[in-house]
Each structure stands twice: as C-alpha cells, then as structure tokens.
C-alpha cells in the first residue's frame, strides 16, 4: 500500500479528526497530506476542487451526513472511484448495510485501534489493486 497519498478526514468533532490523523501517522503515513473537513458539504467542495486518494468520514454530521457524502461521491463521475472508509459510532446492522449498498469501501466502528484502521486500509487498497489488475 502506497503511504504517500492525499487523505481527506471528515468529522464534525475536531478531536476525532486529530485522532484519525495521529493514527495514520502512527501507521506510517508520514509523507501523506492529510486534510480535514467538518461536514459533508465542506468535504464535497474540497473533493471537487482537488484530487484525493482516500476519504475517511464519520456518519453523523450536521449539514451533510457521511452517508449522504458517500452517495454524492458515488454519483459524481470524477469522484465515483474514490475509496471511502466510514469511521463511525453507528453499529446498527441496517446502517452498515446502507453504507455497503451506497458503495462504501470499508466500515470501522468507534472506538477503534491503529491495528483495526491498518487492517481496513490494507483490505481496501488490496481490493483496488486486484480490481485494477483484472480490468
């Protein structure tokens, strides 16, 4: 997995954005440009104006939720292939299914560890590499 990438972390809680950022650095994403947005609307504006390699988003946010952000990403031709990892306190089966149906690449329930984050990211990028090799 390439650890030199541009990641957008989306969460309305600044402490959670900082936790995700610190865990990414702990996992070796030291040459990575990590940017932050506090809701889905701001994230979508950023995604439309500059390229990113990964979005890590919360579900529950004001203005535009993470699931609505995911749906907007999948609806835009220029963004639809962007990997999205949902990091949320939502452990409801229906919401996990809704995220899968909307095209999420991975789902992590808070609280989580660096090991869990690494495993999810590894799986996401392994699947992307495998689908690219077969395309």
Regions found by a protein language model. Name each.
Residues 61:
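Receiver (REC) domain active-site loop signature in two-component systems and cognate sites
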Residues 45, 67-80:
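Short amphipathic alpha-helix used as the core "switch/output" element in two-component signaling
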């Amino acid at each position: 997995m390439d650890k030199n990438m541009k990641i957008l972390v989306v969460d309305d809680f600044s402490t959670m954005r900082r936790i995700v950022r610190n865990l990414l650095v702990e996992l070796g994403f030291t040459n990575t440009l990590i940017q932050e947005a506090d809701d889905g609307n701001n994230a979508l504006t950023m995604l439309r104006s500059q390229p990113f390699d990964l979005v890590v988003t919360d579900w529950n946010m004001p203005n535009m939720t993470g699931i609505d952000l995911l749906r907007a990403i999948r609806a835009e031709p220029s963004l639809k292939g962007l990997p999205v990892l949902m990091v949320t306190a939502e452990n409801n089966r229906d919401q996990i299914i809704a995220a899968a149906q909307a095209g999420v690449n991975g789902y992590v329930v808070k609280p989580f560890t660096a090991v869990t984050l690494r495993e999810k990211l590894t799986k996401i990028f392994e699947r992307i590499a495998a689908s690219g090799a077969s395309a």
